[in-house]
From Swiss-Prot:
Entry keywords, A to Z: Aminoacyl-tRNA synthetase, ATP-binding, Cytoplasm, Ligase, Magnesium, Metal-binding, Nucleotide-binding, Protein biosynthesis, RNA-binding, tRNA-binding
InterPro entries: aa-tRNA-synth_II/BPL/LPL (IPR045864), B3/B4_tRNA-bd (IPR005146), DNA-bd_dom_put_sf (IPR009061), Fdx_antiC-bd (IPR005121), Fdx_antiC-bd_sf (IPR036690), NA-bd_OB-fold (IPR012340), Phe-tRNA-ligase_IIc_bsu (IPR045060), Phe-tRNA-ligase_IIc_bsu_bact (IPR004532)
Any one GO molecular-function label of the UniProt entry: ATP binding
EC numbers for this chain: 6.1.1.20
Family: Belongs to the phenylalanyl-tRNA synthetase beta subunit family. Type 1 subfamily.
Species this protein is from: Synechococcus sp. (strain CC9605)
Location, primary (coarse class): cytoplasm
The protein's name: Phenylalanine--tRNA ligase beta subunit
Pfam short name (any one): B3_4
Compartments where located: Cytoplasm
Length: 807
């Protein structure tokens, strides 16, 4: 927000210097980003009168001028502007003057052999406009001119200083000169002299579809779109960072800068030509745009709308994006004579969605997004109408109001005890003392709050401009501290805090990361935004920066494989990575997020050269699967494998569904050879993907992964081998579970040691051999005690799996 000090002084009494005022505003929360001293643009520039103008003897496009600058004798200046002539008053930069806008210091010299002792300036060279057709003619800017030789800065409005304030999202009142004036008055105690507003102008009801907004529309006749604004208005807009367009548009922008309420003017006659119908107040409505509707804004850019965008319509034709920008076809032009003046309160979320959907942010949208008081909508419309009447002698033919604004807020209880407890005592010469009630009341009333007594303190009704910010007791306490001065309160330490700790799930997740790193995998973090895919449906995001980041990812393994590709191309022997991240599925209206643990084991194992005779060795299926086994064993979790054949990314014969506690947890397998060939990856590439939520639930259910001491055995064990022929569909993990159940309590360990397939076994038959370890708790087991248990295991396998015993 650009704040003109001269304009501010017309609204509030300011006795402080610019530096002191900047310091106070910064300490109060309105950080001053920049101080622009406009007088520096015209330092050494004076009013001059062109007495004579002659053609340059050596150049057709140059003129030699005699200029009266209030000195004893006129000075000679060579000028290249085509609009210079005798009898006009112009700004003259004297020798030694510096023009910061163009980075030029004026020196005496010669141009094509003719002496020149100064420069006649354009508005661009004085930093007032971006482009100029020629030199500035002061007679056209003001009828009453100061004497020749007078500084030109006051005439051009350059005798001013502009503060650039950073306005936070919770202070929309800071986006208006009146709001800043109220803040300065509260900080300094200065008196306010604000423009008078008609708080209750006469209106008629508007009964059209308004899509949840408060909307007013005023018919004004007799304006002139070709007329420029008066100089004082243009100067205020320029200092506020707004370009002057014409008197009608400039008035709406002036009210926005002054009061903070954006307004918009429609050309009434253009609307009738555009729609082909007579236009009255009932012709206007507010609705959501239809997908594919075309809108051409005042910036002459063509945009395609969708249902996220809210539009103002005239006879159902979009004429403005609500709260953002009007259309080019309905805008005020030089031929405009009658207007419809819009003043509305659009819902901040709707304006924000519209602006983001179109990638368009304007002065109006930034104000609507922060929230505005509904009480100012009508008065600001009346304020603009009054200013237009002063400029054009135009007349209103009606004002219509419809819709509803936000619900009126009630008072907030401010407890005296809560304020003193939170702020503590003031540092005073006589020792610490609490802030007295009078000071508290003065701070709040200076903000425009209405106070009523309460047994615990005060009931405070915030003014409309601060209602969104002052909703809680702590908000009021902050305002008191801000106005009194944070540095005036003594420092006091907060109550001791108990040290924080990780939750069991956080501990388990951290343990997972440590375990995978200990097995040789590296943790990576990849982007959740990916390109579109022809193989699967992905959720598209709005306004993507790039086509490669236009959708939400559905898996992690695609990017993991790309990481492996890049590493192997960089002459790395192998690449093993894992990641904990989110995947997304569903539709844009109902996005489902799932946390997964995924990774890739690819390429050669990094073993010492003596272990493989100096040759690299790629991991086989069981070695790669052993990585997960070691991690799960450390968490005291047991995974079982089920054959998996319908996953297109995995080898159909070397893939498994991982089962935890009887429910699928994820999958593990070798990358499909076709995909490995397509990506130029080695065959020994393995993928895994686990449901993180289920994994953490199991790991933290009884905290069983916490190490506990078990006594060392004191008696020897006895091993027996058991080979059975079963159907190929029988998983080894199912057989192991049956063996463990039947072998209790003597069975200590069982493992698969051999698997054989052959024609001699029969169709769909396979031989699986297991090694069983038996051990007693306190005695050495004999065959007499082991054999009954071993027979029980055989019987269980025969019964459950129709196993044929081989040994």
């Amino acid at each position: 927000m650009r704040v003109s000090i001269s304009w501010l002084k017309q609204l509030v009494q300011v006795n402080e210097s610019v530096d002191d005022l900047s310091e106070r505003l910064s300490m109060a929360g309105f950080e001053v980003d920049d101080v622009d001293d406009l007088s520096a643009r015209a330092q050494g520039v004076v009013v001059g009168n062109v007495l004579e103008r002659e053609k340059h003897p050596n150049a057709d496009k140059l003129s030699v001028c005699k200029v009266d600058v209030g000195a004893q004798a006129p000075i000679q200046i060579v000028c290249g502007a085509s609009n210079v002539r005798s009898g006009i008053h112009v700004p003259v930069a004297m020798v030694g003057a510096t023009l910061p806008a163009v980075g030029l210091t004026i020196k005496a010299g010669e141009l094509r052999g003719v002496a020149s002792n100064g420069m006649i300036c354009s508005l661009t060279e004085l930093g007032l406009t971006e482009q100029s057709d020629g030199i500035a003619i002061l007679d056209e800017l003001d009828e009453s001119l100061p004497p020749n030789g007078s500084p030109v800065a006051p005439l051009l409005g350059l005798d001013d200083t502009v503060l650039e304030l950073a306005i936070t999202a919770n202070r929309p009142d800071g986006l208006s000169m009146v709001g800043i004036a109220r803040e300065v008055a509260a900080l300094t105690g200065g008196s306010l002299s604000l423009p008078e507003l008609d708080l209750d102008p006469s209106t008629s009801p508007l009964t059209t579809e308004l899509d949840g907004c408060f909307y007013t529309i005023t018919r004004i006749e007799g304006v002139d779109g070709s007329k420029p604004s008066p100089t004082w208005l243009q100067q205020r807009l320029e200092r506020g960072g707004v370009n002057s367009v014409n008197a009608v548009v400039d008035v709406t922008n002036l009210v926005m800068l002054e009061q903070g309420q954006p307004l918009h003017a429609f050309d009434a006659d253009a609307l009738e030509q555009l729609t082909g119908q007579p236009v009255d107040a009932k012709s206007f409505a507010v609705r959501s745009a239809r997908d594919g509707e075309i809108f051409v804004g005042l910036d002459d850019q063509k945009r395609t709308l969708d249902s996220r965008v809210q539009v103002v319509t005239c006879h159902d034709r979009p004429v403005a994006v609500a709260g953002v920008m009007g259309s080019l076809e309905s805008g005020v032009t030089a031929s405009t004579r009658n207007i419809w003046l819009e003043s509305a309160l659009f819902a901040p979320p709707r304006v924000r969605h519209s602006a983001r959907a179109l990638g368009l942010r304007t002065d109006a949208s930034s104000r609507f997004e922060k929230g505005l008081p509904v009480e100012m909508t009508l008065p600001c419309s009346a304020r603009a109408s009054a200013l237009l009447s002063q400029e054009f002698s135009c007349s209103e033919s009606g004002r219509w109001v419809g819709g509803s604004g936000p619900a009126e807020a009630g008072p907030v209880l401010l407890r005296r005890s809560a304020l003193h407890q939170l702020l503590g005592p003031l540092d005073a010469a006589d020792g610490p003392e609490d802030l007295d009630d009078t000071s508290i009341e003065n701070c709040l009333t200076a903000l425009g709050c209405q106070l009523s007594a309460h047994e615990q303190g005060w009931e405070v009704m915030a003014p409309p401009s601060r209602r969104q910010d002052l909703q809680r007791e702590v908000d009021l306490i902050e305002e008191v501290a801000r106005l009194v001065g944070f540095d005036r309160f003594g420092a006091h330490l907060p109550d001791p805090l108990e040290p924080g700790a990780l939750t069991p799930r956080q501990q388990a997740e951290r343990r997972l990361r440590q375990l995978f790193c200990a097995t040789g995998l590296q943790e990576v973090t990849t982007l959740s935004l990916v390109p579109a895919s022809e193989q699967e449906q992905r959720i598209a995001i709005s306004n993507p920066l790039l086509a490669d980041t236009s959708h939400l990812r559905t898996n992690l393994w695609e990017e993991h494989l790309q990481i492996c590709v890049r590493n192997l191309k960089a002459s790395q022997r192998g690449c093993s990575v894992f990641e904990i991240g989110n995947t997304y599925s569903g539709s844009p209206e109902a996005v489902s997020q799932k946390a997964v643990l995924a990774g890739v084991i690819c390429g050669d194992r990094r073993l010492s050269t003596w272990a493989t005779s100096g040759k690299p060795q790629a991991p086989d299926y069981f070695q790669a699967r052993g990585v997960l086994t070691r991690v799960m064993e450390a968490l005291q979790l047991e995974l079982s494998d089920r054959r998996l054949t319908d996953d297109a990314r995995l080898h159909p014969g070397r893939a498994a569904t991982l089962v935890l506690e009887g429910r699928p947890l994820g999958c593990f397998g070798q990358l499909h050879p076709a995909m490995a060939e397509e990506l130029d990856l080695p065959e020994a590439t393995y993928l895994f993907e686990l449901d993180l939520a289920r994994l953490l639930d199991a790991a933290t259910r009884s905290n069983r992964w916490t190490p506990s001491f078990k006594p060392y055995p004191t008696v020897p064990f006895s091993e027996r081998d058991l080979a059975v022929i079963v159907d190929r569909s029988s998983a080894a993990t199912d057989l192991i579970q049956a063996i463990r159940k039947a072998g209790k309590p003597l069975l200590e360990q069982v493992e698969l040691v051999d698997r054989f397939e052959g024609e001699q076994l029969g169709d769909n038959k396979v031989s699986q051999a297991f090694r069983l370890r038996y051990r007693g708790k306190n005695e050495t087991l004999t065959d007499d005690k082991i054999q009954p248990v071993h027979d029980k295991v055989r019987a269980a396998l025969s019964k459950q799996f129709q196993a044929e015993l081989r040994s």
